[in-house]
């Protein structure tokens, strides 16, 4: 059922993305004076990204606020493990995000967008992200997952909006880029390094630490290595 949910919303997001880009964002780009097709395409991609994260950034904070891991409480990520049941809004948020990242990975791998200079790095980033999403959901590390989602979503919103301003040659591009750098450092590095440190420490000491397939207890040395490696790869 969960797989079907993700598959369905991957398709829904694909159509939503195309509809918004062609019917709303392209006319907006033309109205704002972006005439070159290549620049229009980049603006459309970033504007859609900004719209998505403008919704899911606050949504993620709302869901986190209702959970024990507010505000990036790393010990709560491991207390009472495994976390096998969640309220509906948590599960919906998690799986909708899985749909978004799956859809983005498909766009990238099928080269539906013109490849950027950092194409290989972007592909690797998406592979790591999708692996983290599916493994965290399958093995009940969703409290860690929501924290990583939020750090990525909000920082990506500022990245996308910064790029949009740059395409528009906006006079506030410079100051806004400075704000983006601050947000990016705090979310992608400070908070994620905090989570990485917890993976090395609290992961072992807080809550059970053993492998037991019958009780779905997967917080053990194997998952610790895999989790740390994937999270570290996002920092690279």
Where are the regions a protein language model picked out?
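Membrane-helix and juxtamembrane interface regions of eukaryotic multi-pass membrane proteins
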Residues: 1-143, 163-184, 190-232, 236
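Transmembrane helix-bundle signature of multi-pass membrane transporters/permeases
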Residues: 149-153, 181-185
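Alpha-helical transmembrane segments and their membrane-interface exit regions
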Residues: 151-162
